Amino acid sequence: AARPGVGKSTLGLDFMRSCSIRHRMASVIFSLEMSKSEIVMRLLSAEAKIKLSDMRSGRMSDDDWTRLARRMSEISEAPLFIDDSPNLTMMEIRAKARRLRQKANLKLIVVDYLQLMTSGKKYESRQVEVSEFSRHLKLLAKELEVPVVAISQLNRGPEQRTDKKPMLADLRESGCLTASTRILRADTGAEVAFGELMRSGERPMVWSLDERLRMVARPMINVFPSGRKEVFRLRLASGREVEATGSHPFMKFEGWTPLAQLKVGDRIAAPRRVPEPIDTQRMPESELISLARMIGDGSCLKNQPIRYEPVDEANLAAVTVSAAHSDGAAIRDDYLAARVPSLRPARQRLPRGRCTPIAAWLAGLGLFTKRSHEKCVPEAVFRAPNDQVALFLRHLWSAGGSVRWDPTNGQGRVYYGSTSRRLIDDVAQLLLRVGIFSWITHAPKLGGHDSWRLHIHGAKDQVRFLRHVGVHGAEAVAAQEMLRQLKGPVRNPNLDSAPKKVWAQVRNRLSAKQMMDIQLHEPTMWKHSPSRSRPHRAEARIEDRAIHELARGDAYWDTVVEITSIGDQHVFDGTVSGTHNFVANGISLHNSLEQDADVVILLHRPDAFDRDDPRGGEADFILAKHRNGPTKTVTVAHQLHLSRFANMAR
């Protein structure tokens, strides 16, 4: 594999010359780039050592003709087959290779080159289609017991780096993400950063969208570094953000689209709900309530009393009861200067160096000594089943959230505030577990920590929150009033809508069924992005699978509001088996595709990028992957004017 013009086809023909001319074993090249006459001319140039330009122009000397005559008989008798059929499919290659195996005892297959092959089938992205070609070629090699050389083109990664030497990551068509990007696990329900996966070597189950736009668990089979590249921060209307390279694909209604081709206003997929994790583990309810209260309104700094600041007596009572699990006592400070209760140490006196049970418990969860802007939700909460997630959110909201009815605008206001962006993201992730999509807003603060608010918009999601989560304490009265108001007609922002382009597909199906717009009782609906209910009603009439998946799937179509370059960074990516996508930072992203090849050779010519390079005339064969042996770099001489590479030792 190499960038264009480096000598990929020449190397493939060198393999064939060695196989068929020198060792008299049958080989075949399926060429989608060059015609049969071009290939023959290159073979003659390499064997007779005649300049290819002279052969093409006819400016051959007598010595050239003599050398050509000496080699012609051996070349013509070689069991070398050329197929330059246009638009070759994998099925045609397999059929022709099988016949040659039976007829001529085929020993080598060369395909030039992979990205020009077509399948005739519809794939979600070109990357997946090329990956399928690679997999089928490997199966062909296994079936015929013949080595298959698949020539492939690298992406533009080498051109964008100071060091132009190619890497294995350049062979993958997908983009890359920063080390801090957090992947949503399906086994534990928590998120894990790419950098952590690289350090640990763990390959977890992750949540992924299938072809029906439903969340399914799939294994992440590979995680790898992709070098240093320019990174862009993409921000959505919901406040979700992700940092990725320009080549990383995002899911639009039309299909997977690289970030570089996205623009403000485009709609891309994010999960609207997430199932329970595969490996759920219940927590004691007293621990869950204490944890929610300490995260929401608690203080647990080193060398200071562990405190909780309640907003009302009902919340204080909840903490007093739940604190018993850690052998602690929630005692009110009644002296004049005090205004909050304290969780005292254990009743017995502890030896020096020993911490209180509640401090040890918080330390085990990674929360002890965390300040407000550093707080997050521990993994144990994400592992809990959905009913306990709702209980945790109920007490967390009572400590740091708000639920009220706004009579002026006729809308409910449901939000949670914090100075920790990580905590806000964690709460948004937990809300997806109970089927609620939330929105994040940022409030900068001069001279202090910025704050964020997590909003729940829309009557449908607000009612779901009030019924399945709710709040504890004084806020419960306001919640009941809000629920009563939401039972009547209310303003609905209709943020949960499908991309407007879905109507083009609906209209095509209407035409095919000879139906008119009025038969859907909504003749003006084409002018706006439809709410999810409209495609649902349309799907019932036109019986279209894509509309059915859109109306019932787990994808929320969020809007791109900002794309900003943030400079070069070290980036990473992974491979998900089967569905080839995962959820990162609350957004559905495509993955990089695992290479099926047993051996990957990257071709590097220093003088291809710099004509004055001191290594002019040299080329490196970088053995970047070898399943059954070590990797190595071999330096050779390139004689591209003779259409060949030569051993440096000769």
What are these regions (language model features)?
Residues L177, F194-G201, L262, G574:
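Short, well-ordered loop/turn sites that connect or cap secondary structure elements
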Residues M90-L106, R135-L144, P158-G175, S592-R650:
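C-terminal regions of RecA-like/P-loop NTPase motor modules
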